[in-house]
Regions:
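Metal-ion/cofactor- or nucleotide/acyl-coenzyme-handling active-site neighborhoods
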Residues: 1-245
């Protein structure tokens, strides 16, 4: 069961939220990222290891419970943030994190759709990548305008751009050696965009060379069928535009 603190967050926020993966494209956006200090931001997993991050995130979510180190808030330079732990009920609950239930079995965004729009919050289906899974918490909080960054899925991390192995130790970079995984992510984002638009929301990608937008067309090989799933906007242009409430 979700923690009471999570349930109390329902529809307490509005406007836009920037959700960050940990792709090394963030290193090319450092100047623009500094402007996010005045925005609602949701980061995840190994982001806390990027000590040069130019802003302190509003929210932090952890979905990879194998890495106990990530659960220690005191390794992060960004201590003043709300933390969420997404997992199965039988997983160990960390006292520094608000607990959010994850659905068991084959419950996935691409087949079951997003949750968080109604007055009850079901267990979260997986988005096949942490940022999309965590977006459902932001939907529950009331955000409807979303901008994604660092969604590449082809190489290392912002804190370790030359990494040859994923944090989980289960996947070798570049992840385009695993096209089924990337295709599952594409399908999940396509369903998420449609669900969000049906509720009056927007889903935009600000990842240069990303998996989900037109700028990534020349980046993907080895069996990946590139698909332009999300509209692309540069982060600089998004920062300039007026917030839609």
């Amino acid at each position: 069961m979700h923690s009471d603190a999570v349930l109390r967050l329902h529809n307490t926020q509005e406007g836009r939220c920037f959700i960050l993966g940990n792709g090394p494209s963030l290193l090319k956006q450092v100047d623009e990222l500094a402007a996010l200090k005045d925005e609602a931001t949701f980061c995840c997993n190994s982001f806390g290891r990027w000590k040069e991050a130019p802003f302190s995130p509003t929210y932090y979510g952890l979905t990879d419970m194998h890495d106990v180190e990530m659960m220690n808030p005191y390794i992060f330079p960004h201590l003043d943030m709300m933390r969420f732990q997404v997992g199965w009920e039988e997983d160990e609950h960390h006292k520094e994190f608000h607990w959010v239930d994850k659905a068991h079995g084959e419950s996935q965004v691409h087949s079951n759709g997003l949750v968080g729009f109604g007055d009850e919050l079901p267990s979260l289906p997986t988005g096949r990548t942490s940022p999309l899974t965590l977006m459902q918490i932001a939907i529950w909080m009331g955000y409807r305008e979303f901008y994604f960054l660092g969604i590449e899925q082809t190489r290392g991390y912002v804190n370790e751009p030359d990494a040859v192995m994923s944090t989980t130790g289960r996947m070798e970079f570049p992840l385009d050696k695993n096209p089924k995984y990337q295709i599952a992510i594409q399908r999940s984002f396509e369903r998420a965009r449609k669900d969000l638009e049906s509720h009056g929301g927007t889903l935009i990608d600000c990842t240069p060379g990303g998996l989900l937008n037109e700028t990534g067309q020349d980046f993907y090989r080895r069996g990946i069928q590139w698909r332009n799933i999300l509209e692309y906007k540069s982060l600089a242009d998004v920062i300039k535009q007026e917030v839609r409430v």
